[in-house]
Regions:
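Surface-exposed loop/linker segments characteristic of extracytoplasmic
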Residues: 1-225
């Protein structure tokens, strides 16, 4: 995508902010933009871009793509296991949070002075029934490193039993909260960095180092993580 467009895909496309996790708005996520590069061109062509993320056909909103689902978790139809990194602190998606993906973002590799090796692009997240469909450029497809991996109590507990229909991760009942990364793996979660490498980061990672990895230009380069 970057080679074809000269920029990384926007975290979410919408006329303006704020962006909250409610089914109201255009809210087209980075996942939609990347479909042709994930061997999903027919699905990409089926999306009606004159309509928003919540006005697509059921065939589209409930599509399941194995490339976007963690093999360790049998996610329901229309769900995704991975989120783009919005930044290093818990702020609104409409703000440039020094991450790579945010509202109408057009980040180039030269806009990542910390280096792609030291910048998180994507990470795992724990799905909950409070999330919107996979096209939604909200916390469904964007998270931040302001919370250490797996550190929300409900994420830790959910690894012992799957979410019930009325359970949501801590704070996720607030549509303004973006939230952090997490996984069904004990000990941490998988992350894709800007250089194409994938790293398993411990849930005990140093908080400041982890926050720095979520930022593309804070000038703090982690020596080891």
């Amino acid at each position: 995508y970057e080679m074809a467009h000269g920029v990384l895909p926007p975290g979410t496309v919408n006329p303006d902010g704020p962006i909250v996790s409610e089914p109201d708005g255009y809210h087209m996520s980075w996942t939609v933009q990347l479909l042709p590069y994930l061997d999903q061109t027919p699905l990409f062509l089926a999306v009606d871009f004159s309509k928003g993320a919540y006005d697509q056909s059921e065939e589209i909103t409930e599509a399941s793509m194995s490339v976007l689902i963690c093999p360790s978790y049998p996610a329901p139809t229309g769900a995704v296991s991975y989120a783009g990194c919005h930044g290093g602190t818990e702020v609104q998606i409409a703000e440039d949070n020094e991450g790579v993906f945010y509202l109408n973002s057009r980040v180039r590799y030269r806009d990542i002075p910390d280096g792609s090796t030291n910048t998180i692009f994507f990470g795992e997240k724990v799905w909950s029934s409070a999330e919107l469909n996979w096209l939604s450029g909200t916390r469904t497809s964007l998270r931040n490193t302001g919370h250490e991996p797996n550190q929300l109590p409900s994420i830790r507990d959910s690894r012992e039993k799957l979410y019930q229909s009325n359970q949501t991760p801590d704070g996720m009942s607030d549509p303004a909260v973006v939230g952090g990364f997490g996984s069904w793996h004990f000990g941490g979660a998988q992350f894709a960095l800007g250089d194409g490498s994938v790293r398993f980061l411990s849930e005990n990672i140093d908080k400041l180092v982890y926050e720095s990895l979520g930022k593309r230009a804070d000038g703090t380069l982690p020596v080891d993580f």
